[in-house]
Design a protein with these regions (language model features):
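Cytosolic, long alpha-helical scaffolding segments
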Residues: 1-168
Length: 168
């Protein structure tokens, strides 16, 4: 239900852009396409993992969600740089921020679904501890796999200029 709420918000942002004839720069469009591809990948992996009861697939969602967060931060930073250069407007920034927030929240909910699926299968439900161990665990198999996937997703979702979100 929450994911669909954010989908409606994205639709409303698109309608606002159409009504106000807001068109992002080519660079912003290309950056958003990278983000949208990563969000779509996150949604597909989450729904497939849930539908199939596939814990291995569910474990691939969290590193992808982390990359989406990095992409959102990088797009915001790049927008600020365009604002400072005078090649973008504040009004565009409000719409962009709405889009980014909703994409990020969709992926947050996907992460919640995948982590809950894993935790229930392990007869546990300490999500914060699980995520902390995953991201900062010392030489655990799960943590190592998380970081391998994180690096792979960073390479997959490069900006058109060849930079990863982490490099921004």
């Amino acid at each position: 239900e929450r994911i669909s709420d954010h989908s409606v918000n994205l639709l409303e942002s698109a309608e606002e852009m159409h009504q106000k004839e807001i068109h992002f720069s080519k660079d912003a469009q290309e950056e958003l396409q990278v983000l949208e591809d990563a969000v779509q990948d996150t949604l597909c992996r989450t729904t497939d993992a849930f539908r199939k009861g596939d814990l291995h697939l569910a474990s691939k969602v969290e590193p992808l969600e982390a990359v989406v967060n990095e992409l959102v931060r990088a797009i915001k930073a790049r927008h600020v740089a365009r604002l400072q250069a005078g090649s973008c407007s504040i009004e565009y920034g409000f719409v962009l921020d709405d889009l980014l927030t909703n994409y990020e929240r969709v992926c947050d909910h996907c992460s919640n679904v995948a982590v809950a699926q894993i935790e229930v299968a392990q007869d546990s439900f300490d999500t914060h501890a699980y995520l902390n161990d995953l991201r900062h665990g010392n030489d655990t198999k799960e943590s190592e796999e998380f970081h391998r996937r994180l690096d792979r997703y960073r390479e997959r979702y490069l900006f058109p200029d060849g930079q990863t979100a982490e490099e921004n």
